[in-house]
Design a protein with these regions (language model features):
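Helicase-associated low-complexity/disordered flanking segments
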Residues: 1-82
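Pre-Walker A adenine-sensing motif
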Residues: 79-94
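Walker A/P-loop
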Residues: 97-115
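Walker A/P-loop NTP-binding motif
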Residues: 113-126
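Conserved Walker A/P-loop ATP-binding site and its immediately adjacent core
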Residues: 130-151
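Conserved nucleic-acid-binding Ia/Ib motif block in the N-terminal RecA-like helicase ATPase lobe
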Residues: 145-176
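Conserved small/polar residues in nucleotide/adenosyl-binding loops
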Residues: 177-186
Length: 186
């Protein structure tokens, strides 16, 4: 019996939501190779024995936002104006990065689709490839994981690549350091 596959229809309101988030960073240069020195206990093993010492201790992260406060706020004002939203007086970050963005969508409108597509667009336009999705419950976590699995072929068709994802296990955080290795830049 053939496997049932979902066919996703691109909705204009979803595209507008993605464009709004991506537009916040208009003017950000494309940079896909931001490196840093990893500060973890690293030991040679079967997964990294071929790497040089330099590669072994080098990690990969998204490039820092190069836009200044004024550029970001101008971009946000432009998007708020386009969406008939009251203009923000200032950027809000809560100490987590340069600014916090709030995308509000009704239940059942495709929020998960929107943020996965947003990740692909941020990768395409700015080279960013590391994203963290935080969810409030196990049930939602399972649904998000299933969405990533279900939408892989759909996004492969549009972007020519698949999202590599995993569910974080706080009982074994060291097992995720491999994601910062040079071989995991997608």
């Amino acid at each position: 019996m053939a496997e049932m596959k979902f066919k996703f229809t691109i909705q204009p309101y979803q595209t507008e939501a993605v464009d709004s988030v991506v537009g916040v960073f208009a003017g950000q240069p494309f940079n896909e190779h931001f490196t840093y020195r990893r500060d973890v206990e690293i030991k040679r093993d079967v997964t990294n024995w071929m790497l040089s010492d330099e590669e072994l201790y080098m990690g990969f992260a998204n490039a820092k936002v190069q836009l200044d406060y004024g550029q970001l706020l101008d971009n946000i004002h432009r998007i708020q104006g386009r969406n008939n939203i009251k203009l923000s007086d200032s950027l809000k970050s809560g100490g987590l990065g340069v600014c916090s963005l709030d995308v509000e969508m009704e239940t059942g409108t495709g929020k998960t689709y929107v943020y996965i597509k947003t990740m692909f667009e941020l990768n395409k336009l700015y080279g960013w490839s590391k994203f963290i999705v935080v969810v409030p419950s196990i049930a939602i976590r399972e649904g998000v994981q299933k969405s990533f699995e279900t939408m892989q072929e759909h996004f492969m068709e549009y972007y020519g690549k698949k999202a590599r994802f995993f569910v974080y296990n706080s009982k074994n955080p060291v097992s995720y350091t491999h994601l910062t290795l040079p071989t995991n830049r997608e």
